[in-house]
């Protein structure tokens, strides 16, 4: 995972929730809760923030 210091974005696209870690690295999830949990775990480990876009 990139450690760019940029926030990790969580957003909905069509029926999926996506986590954008930066530098073109994304991850698909079927629920907002799953996406936020994945983003939070990486953010905590790397000292980054999470931005959820409605």
Go through each PLM region and give its residues.
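Short N-terminal "domain-start" leader segments
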Residues: 1-14, 44-53
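Ser/Thr-rich low-complexity repeats and stalk/linker segments
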Residues: 7-8, 20-22
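A short, exposed loop/beta-hairpin motif centered on an aromatic-Gly-Thr core
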Residues: 21-34
